[in-house]
Amino acid sequence: YIEISGGSLGHGLPIGVGMAYSMKLKKEKRKVFVLMGDGESQEGSVWESAMIAPKLNLDNLIVFIDRNNLQGYGRADELLSYEPIDDKFRTFNWEVIRIDGHNVNEIIKA
């Protein structure tokens, strides 16, 4: 089920980090899935969360980024380039897998 709907202002990943950390502390064998947009990745709270998650060893946190190049005020890459986003997440020690989000088999495999 969906626990929260964070909207487009970068709140989903910080909340997801908090939920995943809480589950780790309680030794719960659950996973947190965060679906966010590439435009949302222009928010500072996303990057703060991206930096802290690996430090907390949150291997129970899975993040999907919809790379549709859209955000509230236009095309994401015209307003603030975030590319190469894969490399940015890898710099913070994330395991990054690029998939076709329209392919259910690729999602399950990832």
What do the predicted segments below correspond to?
Residues 1-110:
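Glycine-rich ThDP/TPP pyrophosphate-binding loop and its adjacent helix/strand module
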